[in-house]
Swiss-Prot record:
It comes from Pseudomonas syringae pv. tomato (strain ATCC BAA-871 / DC3000). The active site is at S157 (nucleophile), D323, H356. Belongs to the AB hydrolase superfamily. MetX family. The record marks R325 as: Important for acyl-CoA specificity. Residues 51-360 form the AB hydrolase-1 domain. This is Homoserine O-succinyltransferase. It is an enzyme of class 2 (transferase).
Length: 379
C-alpha cells in the first residue's frame, strides 16, 4: 500500500461527474432524457487546448485508468503502466481524459442507476447502447470540457472500436487514432463466445429477468461462468501452459466432480468469484451486445475503405502475435482498408506470449513502440 507514490505515477486522483440534461437519442430507437458520465483527468490542459487525449475502455473497464484514489489502494488504475509522467501517454505532455461509458456500473448512468420514471433501478429496462452511442456521449463530454479536437483517441479491444468510431462520427475532432488489439467488427466465433457468456447470466435463477437488484440478490453463478469463459479467451494457450501447465492443487487426484484439482481451475474460479463481486450482470450483457453490434462498414455496403473515407486522423494500429480473440489478421484487415482509403497509418505487430490481455501488460517492446508514436504527436 503506497504512502509515497512512484515518481512516474499521476498520484492521487479524484473522479468527477458531468450531468447531461439534453436527451441522447440512441441507435436502438430509444433515448436517455438525462444521464451522468463519471470521468478522471490526468495532466494539465494547455493554453491552446490542443493536448487532450481520450482513453476509451474495454468490456470490464472504467474511468479509473491511472493513479490512486487513496494512499490505501493496493493497485493503481487499470492502464497505469501506460499513463503517467514519462510513460507512453505522458502526462507531462498530454491532458488525459478517461471515462466510464453509459451502461457501465462504476458511476455513469447504467442499469444499476435509478430510473426517474419508476424510482427503481433500470435493470434490464436500461436501453441497449452501441459504440456509436458511446462516442456521441463522449463528444458531449468533450464539449463540456471545452475540447474541440482530441490530440488522440486511444483504446484497446472494445476501446479501440470506440477510437475507430470517433474518426467516422467526428472526423474533424480527432487528430490521431490508436486502435490496439481491436478489430473492425467481431467474428462469428467472438459473437458465439459472447452469447455463451450471456446465456450463463440469463439462465441464472437469481437473474430474475434483470430485476435482481430489487430482490437484493445477484446472479453470481452466471457472472462467474461468463467471466471464466471470457477470461480463457483473453489468454493464449502458451501463456496458460507456462503459468499453469497441468499443475495440481494437491499431490493426488480426488476422482470427483466437485474438487478444484488443477491450478488452472483454481485460477479461473478465483477470477470469476472476484469479478462477480464487483461487476453488474446487466452491464455485462450490454457491453457484449455493443461488441456484437459494432460493424461500421455495414452502413457503407460493407466497404471498409469507404467507411473511413472522410477520416482526417492519422492511425496507429497495434496487435499481438498470440491474441486469438482479436487476432493480428483482423488488425491487418483494418490497415489494408485504411491504406486503400489513402489514410496515414502505421501498423505494429508485437511479439508477445500473453494473448489478448497483452495490451494491458507492461511489455517493454510494446511500451517503447507505444511511447515512440505518442512522442511524435505535435501539439
Amino acid at each position: 500500500m503506497p504512502t509515497v507514490f512512484p515518481h512516474d505515477s499521476v498520484g492521487l486522483v479524484t473522479p468527477q461527474t458531468a450531468h447531461f440534461s439534453e436527451p441522447l437519442a440512441l441507435a436502438c430507437g430509444r433515448s436517455l432524457p438525462a444521464y451522468d458520465l463519471i470521468y478522471e483527468t490526468y495532466g494539465q490542459l494547455n493554453a491552446a487546448r490542443s493536448n487532450a487525449v481520450l482513453i476509451c475502455h474495454a468490456l470490464s473497464g472504467h474511468h479509473h485508468a491511472a493513479g490512486f484514489h487513496s494512499a490505501d489502494d493496493r493497485k493503481p488504475g487499470w492502464w497505469d503502466s501506460c499513463i503517467g509522467p514519462g510513460k507512453p501517454i505522458d502526462t507531462d505532455k498530454f491532458f488525459v481524459v478517461s471515462l466510464n461509458n453509459l451502461g457501465g456500473c462504476n458511476g455513469s448512468t447504467g442499469p444499476s442507476s435509478i430510473d426517474p420514471d419508476t424510482g427503481k433501478p433500470f435493470g434490464a429496462n436500461f436501453p441497449v447502447v452501441t459504440v456509436e452511442d458511446w462516442v456521441n456521449s463522449q463528444a458531449r463530454l468533450a464539449d463540456v470540457l471545452n475540447i474541440d479536437t482530441w490530440a488522440a483517441v486511444i483504446g484497446g479491444s472494445l476501446g479501440g472500436m470506440q477510437a475507430l468510431q470517433w474518426t467516422i462520427s467526428y472526423p474533424d475532432r480527432v487528430r490521431h487514432c490508436l486502435a490496439i488489439a481491436s478489430a473492425p467488427k467481431l467474428s462469428a466465433q467472438n459473437i458465439a463466445f459472447n452469447e455463451v457468456a450471456r446465456q450463463a447470466i440469463l439462465t441464472d435463477p437469481e437473474f430474475h429477468g434483470g430485476s435482481f437488484q430489487e430482490r437484493g440478490v445477484i446472479p453470481k453463478r452466471g457472472l462467474m461462468l461468463a467471466r471464466m469463459v471470457g477470461h480463457i479467451t483473453y489468454l493464449s494457450d502458451d501463456s496458460m501452459g507456462e503459468k499453469f501447465g497441468r499443475g495440481l492443487k494437491s499431490e493426488k487426484l480426488n476422482y470427483d466432480f466437485h474438487s478444484v484439482e488443477f491450478q488452472v481451475e483454481s485460477y479461473l474460479r478465483y477470477q470469476g468469484e472476484e469479478f462477480s463481486g464487483r461487476f453488474d450482470a446487466n452491464t455485462y450483457l450490454l457491453m457484449t451486445k455493443a461488441l456484437d453490434y459494432f460493424d461500421p462498414a455495414a452502413n457503407f455496403n460493407d466497404d471498409l475503405a469507404k467507411t473511413f473515407a472522410n477520416a482526417t486522423a492519422r492511425f496507429c494500429v497495434m496487435s499481438f502475435t498470440t491474441d486469438w480473440r482479436f487476432s493480428p489478421a483482423r488488425s491487418r484487415e483494418l490497415v489494408d482498408a485504411l491504406m486503400a482509403a489513402r489514410k496515414d497509418v502505421c501498423y505494429l505487430e508485437i511479439d508477445a506470449p500473453q494473448g489478448h490481455d497483452a495490451f494491458l501488460i507492461p511489455i517493454p517492446r510494446y511500451l517503447q513502440a507505444f511511447g515512440n508514436y505518442m512522442n511524435r504527436i505535435s501539439l
